[in-house]
């Protein structure tokens, strides 16, 4: 068995880490998320304390996002201006999240806090996504019944339209995303996602992508690339802060990263082949 001791009394099979890295890399490529919402629980199941699982997952997602965003930038799916605004806000939230996790660790509540917040957020995001998909399906069915022409895109939700109508200066136009909105609203979204990311050890993609689509109202393919772009900055900061607290196992993160990077490089080669 290819096991190595990551902690006293904790041995992890290297093939399990490779499998986790490959699986998370595939999810990252398809859904535009960092993949750490899979990595963090998996590391906890393998026996790592929650604080180490969180820090190590952020180290992995930093490298994974750098490789993934290269592909999306090549495809033109990155709104740089929006991504930088989200990144600055997410970094501020990340600091708050790291402090919350350190407090929970000192109180002996890290496992309960990380797992309970992760489960709650997955339920909330999943439920809202299903409700919104159902609403759009009903809207399309009505248009088909009336034989109306279907729109080429339906990115704007009722909630995103209300948020875009809030006039808090300065109002910025994001040409790539096709929206005009106050950066303060976007910063609030970034701060909230960054705080959660710092606590539960994710890049925030599984929350950020639905937020960009349903709250901000940008196309899903732009949301995917832009989220991966901002994750590079926010996850890097979170990784450094967790490393300062001794919460990062670099060998574990590197093993998973090698597997996920191989998957991303395979996708890039397919993209290059399809464009020639």
Residue ranges of model-derived segments:
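Alpha-helical transmembrane segments of multipass membrane proteins
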Residues: 25-26, 42-45, 69-70, 194-195, ...
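Interfacial segments of multi-pass membrane proteins
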Residues: 39-52, 207-222
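Transmembrane alpha-helical segments of multi-pass membrane transport proteins and ion-pumping complexes
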Residues: 21, 25-33, 37, 64-69, ...
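Short hydrophobic/aromatic, small-residue-rich stretches within specific transmembrane helices
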Residues: 57-61, 227-231, 253-257
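Alpha-helical transmembrane segments of multi-pass membrane proteins
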Residues: 17-21, 59-62, 189, 229
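Juxtamembrane transmembrane-helix boundary motif
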Residues: 1-20, 74-192, 214, 244-276
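Juxtamembrane transmembrane-helix termini in multi-pass membrane transport proteins
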Residues: 36-83
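Membrane-interface helix-cap regions at the ends of transmembrane helices
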Residues: 64-75, 233-249
């Amino acid at each position: 068995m290819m096991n190595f001791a990551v902690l006293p009394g904790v041995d992890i099979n290297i093939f399990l880490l490779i499998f986790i890295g490959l699986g998370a890399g595939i999810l990252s490529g398809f859904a535009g998320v960092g993949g750490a919402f899979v990595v963090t629980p998996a590391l906890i199941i393998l026996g790592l304390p929650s604080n180490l699982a969180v820090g190590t997952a952020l180290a992995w997602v930093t490298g994974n996002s750098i490789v993934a965003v290269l592909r999306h930038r090549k495809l033109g799916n990155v709104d740089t201006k929006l991504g930088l605004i989200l990144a600055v806000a997410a970094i501020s939230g990340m600091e708050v999240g790291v402090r919350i996790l350190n407090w929970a660790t000192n109180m002996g509540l890290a496992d309960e806090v990380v797992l309970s917040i992760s489960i709650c957020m997955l339920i909330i995001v999943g439920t809202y996504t299903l409700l919104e998909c159902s609403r759009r399906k009903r809207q399309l069915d009505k248009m088909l019944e009336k034989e109306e022409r279907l729109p080429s895109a339906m990115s704007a939700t009722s909630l995103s339209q209300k948020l875009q109508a809030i006039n808090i200066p300065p109002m910025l136009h994001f040409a790539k995303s096709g929206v005009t909105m106050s950066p303060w609203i976007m910063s609030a979204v970034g701060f909230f996602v960054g705080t959660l990311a710092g606590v539960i050890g994710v890049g925030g993609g599984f929350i950020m992508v639905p937020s960009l689509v349903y709250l901000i109202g940008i196309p899903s393919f732009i949301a995917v690339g832009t989220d991966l772009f901002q994750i590079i900055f926010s996850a890097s900061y979170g990784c450094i802060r967790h490393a300062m607290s001794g919460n990062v196992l670099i060998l574990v993160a590197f093993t998973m990263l090698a597997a996920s990077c191989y998957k991303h490089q395979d996708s890039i080669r397919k993209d290059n082949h399809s464009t020639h």
